[in-house]
């Protein structure tokens, strides 16, 4: 029984001597080496390819509310270009202006319409036309129609006693008709002259009161 025990011998552990160097390899490097590497890294960051960030005061400085509103207003308002193009002389009025003023044909048409058909023709010609020539023609024709009927009633034998003792009323209607006739004719002549003078001036809008 002693022989088997003699065969087995305890061998020395080969891994135990290597434990010391492995522990030394797992230990962190010294602080001096880390500081040197960090300094080299930050020196590299100072190159032109990596500019320094702005300071805290510059990065955190925001404009005030008034400055922001003023900047927004200045950017939203468009620049006004030269206004010389708006004042270009025109050889004639536009079509819309011609429709508002009218021509001599419309004036004569509404004039005879109001003169022949009296107040019915006056209302039709005044309401159906939108030009100054048409309405002034209606006013002038109605004034002449009023003069016509005053003279008919005054000197006709079919209407006796209408102005007996009231000749002032006859004169009132006669003068009223004469004033309406002159007002329509003279105002239309002024408008035609004004249109000719405005044809070489900048764009102008004129309001005519009838």
UniProtKB/Swiss-Prot annotation:
CDD domains: NDFIP1. Residues 1-31 are annotated as: Disordered. It comes from the Eukaryota. Its main location: Golgi. InterPro entries: NEDD4/Bsd2 (IPR019325). Residues 1-105, 154-161 are cytoplasmic. A motif (PPxY motif 1) lies at residues 30-33. This is NEDD4 family-interacting protein 1-like. The keyword Transmembrane applies. May play a role in Golgi structure maintenance. The chain crosses the membrane at residues 106-126, 133-153, 162-182. Residues 127-132, 183-210 are extracellular. Keywords: Golgi apparatus, Membrane, Repeat, Transmembrane, Transmembrane helix. GO terms for biological process: metal ion transport; positive regulation of protein ubiquitination; ubiquitin-dependent protein catabolic process; vacuolar transport. It comes from Danio rerio. It is found in: Golgi apparatus membrane. A motif (PPxY motif 2) lies at residues 53-56. Pfam families: NEDD4_Bsd2. GO terms for cellular component: endoplasmic reticulum; Golgi apparatus; Golgi membrane; perinuclear region of cytoplasm. The gene is ndfip1l. It is a multi-pass membrane protein.
């Amino acid at each position: 029984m002693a022989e088997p025990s003699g065969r087995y011998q305890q061998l020395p552990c080969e891994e135990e001597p290597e434990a010391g160097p492995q522990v030394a390899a797992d230990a962190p490097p010294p602080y001096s080496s880390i500081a040197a590497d960090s300094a080299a890294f930050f020196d590299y960051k100072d190159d032109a390819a990596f500019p320094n960030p702005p300071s805290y005061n510059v990065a955190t400085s925001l404009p005030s509310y008034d400055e922001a509103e003023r900047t927004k207003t200045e950017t939203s308002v468009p620049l006004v270009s030269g206004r010389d193009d708006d004042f270009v002389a025109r050889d004639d009025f536009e079509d819309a202006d011609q429709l508002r003023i009218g021509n001599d044909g419309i004036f004569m048409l509404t004039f005879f319409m109001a003169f022949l058909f009296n107040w019915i023709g006056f209302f039709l010609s005044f309401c159906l036309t939108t030009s100054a020539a048409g309405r002034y023609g209606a006013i002038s024709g109605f004034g002449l129609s009023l003069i016509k009927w005053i003279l008919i009633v005054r000197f006709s034998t079919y209407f006796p006693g209408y102005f007996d003792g009231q000749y002032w009323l006859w004169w009132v209607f006669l003068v009223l008709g004469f004033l309406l006739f002159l007002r329509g004719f003279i105002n239309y002549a002024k408008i035609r002259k004004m249109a000719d003078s405005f044809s070489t001036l900048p764009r102008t809008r004129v309001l005519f009161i009838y």
